[in-house]
Regions:
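Conserved C-terminal helix/tail region of periplasmic/extracytoplasmic solute-binding proteins
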Residues: 159, 163-187
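Secondary-structure end/capping motifs
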Residues: 95-168
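Surface-exposed patches in mature extracellular/periplasmic domains of secreted proteins
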Residues: 32, 121-125, 173-177
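Pocket-lining segment of extracytoplasmic ligand-binding domains
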Residues: 38-125
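Short glycine-enriched loops at secondary-structure junctions
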Residues: 8-11, 75-78, 129
């Protein structure tokens, strides 16, 4: 059995990896001995690791450093039957509820900007020291599959993802699905 290195047992990358392997009927021995994406990156570049799960921007960095490495599949939405999952949520204080429409609009515009003008987005992120120069590429932005959805639009995807977490790592959500009040203020 081939070994697949994954960082962070019980984290999103681990859960999505186990889900993907199960869906595809693949058998890998999962190894969690490298605890950060940086350690996995170093292991891949040093030839200590042959197959690993790695997120952006680490993926882009190692692909630039070693052209013999390649992507086997994407866990974001590996095929047309996979639903994809909401993986980031923007949470704000109740005092900002009256600004919800404005916030949704700004977030949507920001996501559209990153997708339509990735190099400009990268330049801004680097100029503000959010990412080190050379870490991101337009391809890394594309692989992130950035897409803004309002709470109402994302609700089913969020619930699907929570059900997936419950199936593979229930303690990550406190052992049970949240109640109906978890996703509030839909638009």
């Amino acid at each position: 059995t081939e070994t697949l290195y994954v960082f962070g047992a019980g984290t999103t990358p681990d859960i999505l990896t186990r889900y993907y392997l199960h869906q595809k009927g693949l058998s890998y021995s999962l190894n969690y001995s490298f605890t950060t994406p940086g350690e996995i990156s170093q292991g891949l570049l040093a030839g200590q690791i042959q197959t690993a799960v790695l997120a952006e921007p680490f993926l882009s960095v190692i692909l630039r450093k070693d052209s013999t490495l390649s992507i086997k599949t994407s866990l974001n939405n590996p095929d047309s039957t996979s639903p994809g999952f909401a993986q980031t949520a923007i949470v704000y204080a109740p005092s900002l509820n009256d600004k919800r429409t404005l916030l949704d609009s700004l977030l949507n515009e920001s996501c559209q900007f990153a997708v339509s003008q990735p190099q400009k987005a990268i330049d801004i992120l680097e100029s503000r020291n959010i990412f080190a120069p050379g870490t991101l590429t337009p391809e890394s932005i594309e692989r992130c599959r950035i897409n803004y959805l309002s709470t109402g639009e994302a609700k089913e995807s969020i619930l699907d993802f929570l059900r997936l977490i419950e199936q593979y790592e229930p303690k990550a959500i406190g052992g049970k699905l949240p109640d109906n009040g978890f996703i509030s203020g839909e638009q």
